[in-house]
């Protein structure tokens, strides 16, 4: 009996021990599980959240649609057109061996004009690459077709590309963008940040198929802006077409024309020829990209002579009716002469006949600082601060004292280098009777500010003298416009060759204002290296001045101010 009880007690103890052991194991497991949960959810939660986000969360750039560039009347000069980019994520393409025989992959190859073998090469090129562009700037119709193919690992991105409605007419001024939508030339480059705004960043979540399942937030984004230029599309078209015709007719290397509103300083037209089609860069020539109106510098020739006359009148060195001996003369074995011989000329005659002898003798009566400062006063060799990237400053001599020969040649436009825009500004100041107004490429209602830099009466005197340049039989007569008074100055400058010596190539200038009785517009024409029989400014660029200004005055409804000329 006692033996039986003993065995029973041992059995119970054994069973209890097994139960306790099992419970202990279960309890230990629960403790470990609890600790693991605490570790994962509390202690290591940030790391796990990071790992989860790394697999599903993406930061996607949100690019603003680029702002529109309009002319002063709202006509679009550059617009953003919606397009698509196509890219692949090779890590999401599982059946890589079946691509060659897959009809949908063949369809993608054909629509993008990418050989199928090349497509397969992209997919197999690197196992770690998750982003490979297949095509950029495809039209939305092709994008919809590709989307309908439902190929794994093939995705579309919304983009935009630039379209320029005026084409070549304002190409150098407006500029172009690169494939990523960044301005790389012209106004597109100079105002890039204004046109684009600040790109934002968007947090998105993707599923294991790469599809966006959640947009979380949008940060750091500012909108793009539209830009209204001072340019008038109609006037720009007139200026470009007439300039382009002249460049072709004279077999010139290039031409530049700038039209400015004298009352506000607004640039109404700025044209270069030859130009290019910004909507099709396939046949573009690099040298035609530059806006030579601001990037290139030239010796201005006789177009600076009015400055010398005005300064001499102001200083009392000459009077309106002064007579100057204009016989050729020598300065240290260098002969100063004119195209046509004149024994003597009055001051009007010196400008009318463009006498190097006469203007140089006047300049020799001034000291160096007076002469150079008179050029600086009118903005020569000084930046216009127009806001366009690539503008050159030009060059003026820094010597405290010029030799007589240097002073003489300086008076008729040699020994200094200026941009065409600086020359246009000079004649705009003359047209405003000596008031400087900052130039603007942006539409403005009123001048930014005004500053008188020269007494009105001397400027008006010289304007009257400049009117005679376009009179019948004179060197600038081809710049005349029936019914209107124009005040102009022509010029012809020899070009400097690659070795620093003057060569038998020329630049033909005509710059002036109209109508002369109440100037509204200044116009500057430059024709570089005309290769026909004519190369003088009065023969090459003056006719272009007349053709353009005539149409501008008509378009802007400016009343004729020369009724005698109109009736004759």
Swiss-Prot record:
Keywords, comma-separated and alphabetical: Carboxypeptidase, Cell cycle, Cell division, Cell inner membrane, Cell membrane, Cell shape, Cell wall biogenesis/degradation, Hydrolase, Membrane, Peptidoglycan synthesis, Protease, Septation, Transmembrane, Transmembrane helix
Enzyme Commission no: 3.4.16.4
Chain ranges passing through the membrane: 19-39
Location in the cell: Cell inner membrane
Bilayer topology term: Single-pass membrane protein
Recorded metabolic or biological pathway in which this protein acts: Cell wall biogenesis; peptidoglycan biosynthesis
Reactions accelerated catalytically: Preferential cleavage: (Ac)2-L-Lys-D-Ala-|-D-Ala. Also transpeptidation of peptidyl-alanyl moieties that are N-acyl substituents of D-alanine
BP GO terms, sorted: cell wall organization; division septum assembly; FtsZ-dependent cytokinesis; peptidoglycan biosynthetic process; proteolysis; regulation of cell shape
Cysteines engaged in disulfide bonds, as pairs: none
A GO cellular component annotation in the UniProt record: plasma membrane
Family: Belongs to the transpeptidase family. FtsI subfamily.
HAMAP family to which the protein is assigned, alphabetical: FtsI_transpept
PANTHER family found in the cross-reference section: PEPTIDOGLYCAN D,D-TRANSPEPTIDASE, PEPTIDOGLYCAN D,D-TRANSPEPTIDASE FTSI
Protein name, UniProt field: Peptidoglycan D,D-transpeptidase FtsI
Organism: Buchnera aphidicola subsp. Schizaphis graminum (strain Sg)
